[in-house]
């Protein structure tokens, strides 16, 4: 640390140091030894897939059978293996939906149908739930398997949009009901209820994380489909092996930067950056995109910490100018520590350029570089606020903070390596224009960060967060602010849900990519800022995803 402070003639005491903890993983992910049994597992998975495709098609004349099969396929995290089959099944279910709901008073089936169809953009009406009202402020709970039905209703409410009062009321009712009966429930229902109430609904949970949990829950149900369960286990482990190989490759690259010794002031978070990338898309066909995103996020994290936790104002001006110019000749003008980060930035994007040429989409390199410049400008503006000890209003803060959260840059980076049929030039322009769908994700990204991280930021010289801005501006306490921000995030989720309803401007897979980025944020900030402070909860998730195979 002292070496770099001396290199620019600045003492450590005058820098906004954050004292981040070191990497918790050591060299655990550098070496990867593939298992010899993978070829046999892959062959077995292919055989099961063929059989299950046939079975799903045969279920087309049985509404409930097809409905439950699609739900299981999605919850088990294997829907990417059945994209066309699931699309066809949902089209079939949509055509039968109105007639089914008219002649059926099954709360569970109605809610499940509604959720599955809404998830895929079908404009099904929330009026199907009117028949379950009890004439007061609540809903009639079925006598048999009431908790299971109400749980599915609770899950369905997370697909609501603005103006759907029946679902707003149902959200409160179902949550309160499940909380009141939870102590009387047995597993596996109790586990599902606990997860939905205290962790994530299916709509907001990260697919790969939720699949890992659901596999063990699904297995406990006597009615589980043995073929689906076996395929889910095989596929999870095969994809995990791919992720381990990618993470090993990224870890070896990261080690060459010598972050712990040469950049000891930054967050050493390569593994967590890869988690973020695999959260956006875990599927094997996104391997190139995932590798681009993981490295891009790792470098963005270094940049963030240079601006936020070490650089002086004068140094940051030089750094920003160098990023704007994007030229190796700028290296000579930068302090030693900045040279490492700047060279890493240029090197990564040189690799990205090569990959994009292979993909036949070289035009995307421009957008990737513009996204990094976009972040640098925002970080610099925040540094100027810090230098001037500026106290922004909440509105002024949010205008800048929805840029400094890095989420626009994240989305652009996540699109770079995706196939052309999903991402186009128009899609990049759309993201940069910040339409309501993107704006909603930015609000969630910023507020969830500030709610969990503002106490840490108060410990050092830092621009105040949305929490402090709102408290001072409205003369209210922290709890009132947090409550208000959660309401704003619920409103933003409604905007996201609205953005999925057909007709859509861009392909549903692109919208899901963006949605998954929001879901990843929610996971990371569930127990505080688990990217900055990698605690037991985040460590356990990473172990479950990359280190511990699902037992057969």
Swiss-Prot record:
GO terms for cellular component: cytoplasm. Optimum temperature is 40 degrees Celsius. Its main location: cytoplasm. It is found in: Cytoplasm. Pathway: Secondary metabolite biosynthesis; terpenoid biosynthesis. Mg(2+) 2 binds at residues 304, 308. InterPro entries: Isoprenoid_synthase_dom_sf (IPR008949), Terpene_cyclase-like_1_C (IPR034741), Terpene_cyclase_plant_C1 (IPR044814), Terpene_synth_N (IPR001906), Terpene_synth_N_sf (IPR036965), Terpene_synthase-like (IPR050148), Terpene_synthase_metal-bd (IPR005630), Terpenoid_cyclase/PrenylTrfase (IPR008930). It is an enzyme of class 4 (lyase). Mg(2+) 3 binds at residue 457. One of its GO terms (biological process) is diterpenoid biosynthetic process. One of its GO terms (molecular function) is terpene synthase activity. Mg(2+) 1 binds at residues 304, 308. Gene3D superfamilies: Farnesyl Diphosphate Synthase (1.10.600.10), Terpene synthase, N-terminal domain (1.50.10.130). Its EC number is 4.2.3.70, 4.2.3.87, 4.2.3.93. A motif (DDXXD motif) lies at residues 304-308. It catalyses: (2E,6E)-farnesyl diphosphate + H2O = patchoulol + diphosphate; (2E,6E)-farnesyl diphosphate = alpha-guaiene + diphosphate; (2E,6E)-farnesyl diphosphate = delta-guaiene + diphosphate. Optimum pH is 7.0-7.5. Keywords: Cytoplasm, Lyase, Magnesium, Manganese, Metal-binding. Belongs to the terpene synthase family. Homodimer. Involved in the biosynthesis of patchoulol. Also produces at least 13 additional sesquiterpene products, including alpha- and beta-patchoulene, alpha-bulnesene, seychellene, pogostol and alpha-guiaene. The Asp-Asp-Xaa-Xaa-Asp/Glu (DDXXD/E) motif is important for the catalytic activity, presumably through binding to Mg(2+). This is Patchoulol synthase. It comes from Pogostemon cablin.
